[in-house]
Amino acid sequence: MLILTRRVGETLIIEDNITVTVLGVKGNQVRIGINAPKEVAVHREEIYNRIQADKKDERNERNDKYEKKYQNEDACDK
């Protein structure tokens, strides 16, 4: 992990097209602004984890449907 120190108003640049700017510090909270292309997904960690969990649930539901479908077809063939 790269660790950097920035002050309010200072910016980090990631590759050529993403900037992260420190907008403010208040107690133990830091406000940041992120400029990134539309095709780059930017999420808070808890939101990202929820999205991944939802995707996993959707995959499991699809797998369950396929398994039930093929089990029913196998039962009909007997």
UniProtKB/Swiss-Prot annotation:
Keyword Repressor set for record: yes
Region annotated Disordered, chain positions: 53-78
Source species, domain of life: Bacteria
Disulfide bonds: none
Biological processes annotated in GO: mRNA catabolic process; negative regulation of translational initiation; positive regulation of translational initiation; regulation of carbohydrate metabolic process
Keyword RNA-binding: yes
Cell location: Cytoplasm
InterPro entries registered for this protein in UniProt: CsrA, CsrA_sf
GO MF, one example: mRNA 5'-UTR binding
UniProt keyword terms in alphabetical order: Activator, Cytoplasm, Repressor, RNA-binding, Translation regulation
Signal peptide location: none
Family the UniProt entry places it in: Belongs to the CsrA/RsmA family.
Function: A key translational regulator that binds mRNA to regulate translation initiation and/or mRNA stability. Mediates global changes in gene expression, shifting from rapid growth to stress survival by linking envelope stress, the stringent response and the catabolite repression systems. Usually binds in the 5'-UTR; binding at or near the Shine-Dalgarno sequence prevents ribosome-binding, repressing translation, binding elsewhere in the 5'-UTR can activate translation and/or stabilize the mRNA. Its function is antagonized by small RNA(s).
HAMAP family listed in its UniProt record: CsrA
Subunit-structure text: Homodimer; the beta-strands of each monomer intercalate to form a hydrophobic core, while the alpha-helices form wings that extend away from the core.
Name of this protein: Translational regulator CsrA
